[in-house]
Amino acid sequence: MPKQLDKLLQQLITLHPKYIDLSLNRLLELLQKIDNPHLKLPPIIHIAGTNGKGSTLSYLRHIMMENKFLVHAYISPHLKSFNERIILANKEVVTSKLLKNLQYIKKINNDNPITFFEITTAVAFYLFSKQKADFLILETGLGGRLDATNVVKNSLINIITPIDIDHQEYLGKNIIKITNEKLGIVKKNSNIIIGKQKRIITSYIKEKIKKKKNTKLFYGKQFKIMKTNSKKFTLRYKKIHYSINNPNLLGNHQIENASLAVAAILRLNELGYNFSNRIINQGIFKTKWAGRLEKGQLNNIPVYLDGAHNPDGAIQLLKFFQKQKNKCWLIFGMLNNKDLLSYLKIIKPITLGVIAIKIKGEKNSFTPQQISMNCSKLNIACFEKKSI
């Protein structure tokens, strides 16, 4: 069964190339053919941004599950198996159900032009509409305004995580254009929660949404981390201070991601839900999220796995290892639409050297030779390898 699924997913990637003009029309036409499942979903929390989307989603999901809610979630990309992307009522979709519904939607689409992300999003919405849940948490794949997840008509809460330069070929060449695309998820009458941003981004967002009647919560104004220690952080939400367990996920940026999730939960309380401080703390404590400064060991040597791939992500890695007073060898691969040289410049102070690899199964990955060439420009030692 897993081999059948992998084969079908590969067919969808081949038949429907990733690089295609951004539009919602193709997906809307397909959804209409399957009775518009995107209009039959539980209350939606929709998350856009550049960094921290997946972690914020995971904190929210674990807090909600701790409160005995059934939660659907849509996540991208996946780390190990495609099933990770679709959470049905607190559980990963089983392979047999995923395969059956992929085959069905593929047949309905009848090889009409559509991207891999669009057709798999159609499958996710179809599955979500067939099973009861209390909430659906959606993570955008790319941008917001024209992201496939943005076919939904209403959302209870819109969350904007930290925004950085990324996907410029689709979203625009500067941070303001990128921010504008991310804000495209904001729906009429939804509650807007804005995470910690660069000053220029916060100013732009305030101006952009000031005429909207939505409830708006900005990091630094309506909620803010007041202090942290080794076990807890204090979050001010409006005029009340909350003592929250530190996440088990490493890095100070994870405290910021957790604070964004807690702000969303506290807003839900204002809307009539009931999440106690104990539930919030237990949910934060139990949250796990692979590939985010995930610590392991190899022959008694500490190994960290992290998916940071843009300047802000690199800065968080830099801060973490500087705080540890450690330098590390970097086993490193990156897609060729990322700013490789800027990334390497940021992490150079904590880097003993780079082992350059090509990302397995990714045609659009930098080659080890290209990574090595950029390392040479910065006098970073680099060794080229075929794989990990």
Model-derived regions, located:
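C-terminal helical cap/extension that packs against the catalytic core
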Residues: 197-217, 229-232, 302-305, 311, ...
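Conserved catalytic-core segment of NTP-binding enzymes
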Residues: 145-146, 152-212, 340-342
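Short internal beta-strands
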Residues: 74, 191-196, 331-333, 352-360
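ATP-dependent carboxylate-amine ligase catalytic core
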Residues: 18, 24, 28-32, 37-42, ...
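Hydrophobic anchor at the beta1->P-loop junction of P-loop NTPases
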Residues: 45-47
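Charged, amphipathic alpha-helical linker segments immediately N-terminal to NTP-binding catalytic cores
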Residues: 1-20
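Nucleotide phosphate-binding/pyrophosphate-handling subdomain across enzymes
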Residues: 41-43, 130, 135-140, 146-159, ...
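Hydrophobic positions on the alpha1 helix immediately C-terminal to the Walker A/P-loop
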Residues: 55-60
